[in-house]
């Protein structure tokens, strides 16, 4: 009988933001685990704030009832309302009850997929704390990738929920050394382990190393940023560097 890991995470599996938990899911698959990858829920309210291509992709996954990628099955639940840092949606009531308004029932879905009992219960989202009381597991892990209070989308209730999960799981792993001190609310520091982000060497070995045509006319030396440009992007730092390194070309790709 194969080992199983249930991953309750923030970003949907096909997101353009392929972050730590996506890579861990594939690593678990390589180790022979069956993986159920559940990401943060959507709701009808989402369309009011942003009917983006990302939302449409999440809706597509939900309507299909989830999809498989090898040994990984990924799914986006849909609820009547979901936790957000907005009036009412930031309340403890929404945070603690959104799963009771999912259609189909998220808990039934998980159990019907055969993940009512798992070897590992994995978190990187504060929205899924109820799984600690509803799923049978051998080990539970919370991965802290960033300091949650640094994100405007994270409500006080969500931060408190993350702390509650941290104090309940068997192990907490974190990606930056300063996070251990920042999370003073985590009581048992002995279960916290520093596990920095890794590098997919095979990806870079196979990559095309030719200079993109779009960059040919931009003089060297070049400083290139590739990634998300969101409210956490340090524009002031980039401006400071560009001002003090006038002979360098700064290229931002988002």
Predicted feature locations:
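Nucleotide-activated donor-dependent transferases that construct or modify glycoconjugates
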Residues: 2-21, 39-41
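A short, active-site helix/loop in glycosyltransferases that binds the activated sugar's phosphate group
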Residues: 169-192
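Short amphipathic alpha-helix
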Residues: 20-28
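Conserved catalytic-core segment of nucleotide-activated headgroup transferases in glycan assembly
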Residues: 91-92, 96, 201-254
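A conserved catalytic-core segment of Leloir-type glycosyltransferases
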Residues: 48-112
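Membrane-proximal helix-turn-helix segments that form the acceptor-binding/catalytic region
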Residues: 24, 106-111, 155-175
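Active-site proximal beta-strand in glycosyltransferases
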Residues: 120-122, 132-149
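Carbohydrate-associated surface elements
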Residues: 178, 195-198, 204-207
């Amino acid at each position: 009988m194969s080992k199983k890991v249930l991953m309750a995470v923030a970003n949907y599996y096909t997101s353009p933001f392929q972050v730590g938990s996506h890579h861990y899911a594939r690593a678990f698959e390589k180790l022979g685990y069956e993986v159920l990858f559940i990401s943060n829920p959507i709701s009808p309210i989402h369309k009011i704030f942003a009917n983006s291509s990302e939302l449409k992709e999440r809706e597509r996954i939900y309507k299909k009832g989830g999809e498989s990628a090898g040994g990984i099955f990924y799914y986006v639940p849909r609820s009547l309302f979901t936790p957000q840092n907005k009036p009412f949606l930031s309340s403890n009531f929404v945070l603690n009850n959104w799963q009771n308004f999912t259609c189909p029932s998220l808990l039934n879905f998980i159990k019907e997929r055969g993940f009512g009992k798992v070897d590992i219960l994995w978190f990187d989202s504060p929205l899924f704390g109820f799984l600690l009381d509803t799923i049978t597991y051998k080990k539970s892990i919370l991965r802290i990738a960033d300091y949650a209070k640094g994100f405007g989308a994270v409500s006080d209730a969500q931060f408190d929920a993350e702390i509650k999960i941290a104090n309940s799981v068997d192990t907490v792993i974190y990606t930056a050394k300063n996070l251990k001190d920042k999370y003073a609310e985590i009581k048992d520091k002995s279960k916290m382990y520093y596990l920095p982000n890794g590098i997919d060497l095979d990806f870079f070995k196979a990559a095309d190393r030719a200079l993109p045509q779009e960059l040919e006319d931009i003089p060297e030396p070049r400083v290139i940023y590739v990634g998300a440009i969101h409210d956490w992007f340090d524009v002031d730092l980039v401006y400071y560097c560009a001002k003090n390194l006038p002979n360098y070309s700064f290229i931002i790709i988002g």
